[in-house]
Structure formats: C-alpha cells, structure tokens
C-alpha cells in the first residue's frame, strides 16, 4: 500500500479546490471535491482560523483520509478575544487582554500538541504566545503573568 501525505493549512470550513489544496492533491488522482467537502465538514468548528490538515492518500485504491490538527495558539487567542490580528508593535501597543480562565481553556485545547507535562506549564506556554501578539493577561504583561503563576497567584485555575 503506497501512501502520499499532503500537509496544507486551510481556513476552517472554507477549503476550496484552488491553492493550496488543489495543486497538491489533484495529481494524486482523487476527487478533489470529495476531499474539500470532507475537510470543510471536519474544520467547520474552526471557522475563520487557519487549520493544519493532513490528507493521507492511498495511491493504490485512491482512497483518502483526513486528519485535522489544532489551529496555532495565536489563532486560538485571537479568536477567543474576537480580534482580527495581534498588535503591530507588541511591546508598545496592547491589542487585548486575556483572562486566566481563557488562557487555561486554550491550554486545555492545545495540551496534547504541547511539550508541557502540566496544565500550569501549558498555560504558561499559551501566555508566552501573548508576548509576540501584544496581548496582556489579567491586565498585566505576559511575562509578569507567568511570574505570578510561578508565585502561585493563580493556583485555583490549575487544581485538577
């Protein structure tokens, strides 16, 4: 069984037969519209976000399987806050304020794809992404929020 794997980044629920999907999958001899339909069905919950998708094609019988990844942390943060984009000057301009509850929620979504062993450390990873997007956490800079987590100020969020 020979397989080909195509990795693409698509907008949730809005994949089309055009680039980047069409040119990558078309030469493999499978019905592109069936692929698009299945991708859109599986990514509809991530509407508007960039979602990593793997199309695994069995070149012998031309069957395919779709694996949907989790959107990048920055996309989840921006969606949670209702932002179109982060700050253009992260150190000078604040684009939004993430609550600790929202940070923990995103960490739980991403935990399986992160290197952290604990929810507390996964949340600190999410907050680290806030540094580059210009988003504060609980009204403080992301670095200060990470220090506050280390000091135990938000331990009530990590009791599982």
Curated annotation (Swiss-Prot):
GO terms for cellular component: large ribosomal subunit. One of its GO terms (biological process) is translation. InterPro entries: Ribosomal_uL11, Ribosomal_uL11_C, Ribosomal_uL11_C_sf, Ribosomal_uL11_N, Ribosomal_uL11_N_sf. Pfam families: Ribosomal_L11, Ribosomal_L11_N. Keywords: Ribonucleoprotein, Ribosomal protein, RNA-binding, rRNA-binding. The keyword Oxidoreductase does not apply. GO terms for molecular function: large ribosomal subunit rRNA binding; structural constituent of ribosome. Gene3D superfamilies: Ribosomal protein L11, C-terminal domain (1.10.10.250), Ribosomal protein L11/L12, N-terminal domain (3.30.1550.10). HAMAP family: Ribosomal_uL11. Forms part of the ribosomal stalk which helps the ribosome interact with GTP-bound translation factors. Part of the ribosomal stalk of the 50S ribosomal subunit. Interacts with L10 and the large rRNA to form the base of the stalk. L10 forms an elongated spine to which L12 dimers bind in a sequential fashion forming a multimeric L10(L12)X complex. Belongs to the universal ribosomal protein uL11 family. This is Large ribosomal subunit protein uL11. It comes from Methanococcus aeolicus (strain ATCC BAA-1280 / DSM 17508 / OCM 812 / Nankai-3). The gene is rpl11.
